[in-house]
A protein has these predicted regions:
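Helix-loop-strand module that forms the ligand-binding subsite of alpha/beta enzymes
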Residues: 75-168
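N-terminal beta1-alpha1 ligand-phosphate binding loop
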Residues: 18-49
Length: 206
């Protein structure tokens, strides 16, 4: 571990471990969304922040049933899919990156179902995600990127999270896997987003 990452807090104690999870809503596990989330992760790792990528493609995510049985329980009562496990990891993390490709001018169906489930859980159990640092990123071929980013940002803002910005909208352009690497401006924006996210998480921990 570098000397920078071994710095003590002002009170002389060693800093707590910091962790960010990324949730990829793409059906393509190794596609462009994974690439751009990975670029943000690179900057977080440089600052000693642990990262973990969660692929929604690995899980069944059912839509919200609107039963409100989650009230007072801190999580969804239905545990026959992947939602409850992933949501627990969100609650334990310091930061959360939501990533999605653009499908029909919005987030993917799995990401939408995940956000709807999470939205009700937090609404009926206020404060579960309060003051966690969040960022939304989208892999886009042509149109719909702003709507996609807005959908994820609205979830985070409505749940009392602190949303990080960058030098431009958090979208990177590309159709085929790997095309996003040719979007120099978009990838630079992801690097800056990672730097800003690391800075904020460390300040909140200080």
């Amino acid at each position: 571990m570098s000397g920078r990452n071994m710095e003590l807090h002002r009170n002389g104690t060693a800093p707590e471990a910091m962790k960010v999870i990324g949730i990829n809503g793409s059906a393509r596990k190794d596609g462009n969304t994974t690439i751009i989330v990975g670029k943000v992760f690179d900057e977080l790792n440089k600052e000693g922040i642990e990262t973990e990528l969660i692929q929604l493609a690995d899980y069944e995510i059912q839509p919200c049933r609107g039963c409100f049985a989650c009230k007072g329980r801190g999580n969804c009562v239905f545990t026959n899919d992947g939602f409850a496990e992933i949501f627990n990891r969100m609650v334990m993390a310091d930061g959360i990156i939501l990533g999605s490709p653009v499908y029909s001018a919005d987030v993917s169906a799995k990401m939408k179902a995940f956000l709807e489930r999470g939205g009700v859980v937090v609404a009926t159990n206020p404060g579960l995600l309060r003051h966690k640092v969040g960022a939304a990123v989208a892999a886009v071929r042509r149109g719909g990127g702003m709507t996609t980013v807005d959908t994820m940002n609205h979830f985070m803002l409505n749940k009392e999270m602190i949303v990080v910005g960058s030098t431009y909208w958090n979208m990177v352009y590309g159709k085929n896997i790997g095309d996003v690497l040719s979007d120099d401006e978009g990838m630079a924006n992801m690097r800056n987003l990672g730097e800003n996210m690391a800075w904020l998480i460390k300040r909140l921990k200080d």
